[in-house]
Amino acid sequence: VMSILKEYGVHATFFHIGYTITQENADILKRQITEGHAIANHSLSHNFNLLYPGRVPNQSQIVSEVNQTMANFQAVLGKDFKTRIFRYPGGHMSWQGLESTDQALAKEGVQWIDWNMLCGDAEPASVRPTTSESMMAYLDGSQKYFPESHVKVVLMHDTAGKELTVQTLPQIIEYFKDQGYTFGVLE
């Protein structure tokens, strides 16, 4: 993914799950920063049963996981590293009753962000795109949910099993460039 982004001269924000942040992947994290990408927080566990037991947000668990993930970042990247951006696992829009958690995170200097477009790579297998063409159609169709938004935040994943996302990334970049968009990071 980073090689494609570099080839096209664009930057992205990478949301990391805290338990994966180790010295073994320090080179990847450092490369992301060196190449101008942003690194952000996506919880420690990504475990819905811990974060939202019974579909109810567990504020103390969420805040604790955000803080532990920050500690993991700092253990790898240095004590001066700080990210202010957090993406709720499953997305903020998927859960009710997050207002007090949002306020608690804000007191920690953390702001949540959601996406307003997606390529479909995290959807259930029955509707997940299986070709670059279907992924592009899915992406294009997702615009209808926030048609007035001038800023597009696209949900994509670069984990194992997401080869189609990597394969389609050049087309996705060109899609937005053709519409006059510029690329930036969330900070």
Segments the model singles out, each with a brief description of its role:
Residues 15-19, 42-45, 86-91, 115-120, ...:
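Active-site-proximal beta-strand/loop segments in catalytic clefts of secreted hydrolases
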Residues 1-88, 175:
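Active-site beta->alpha N-cap acidic-glycine motif
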Residues 30-33, 102-107, 171-174:
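Short, surface-exposed basic-aromatic patches at helix termini and helix-loop junctions that form
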Residues 2-13, 75, 148-187:
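Terminal accessory/targeting
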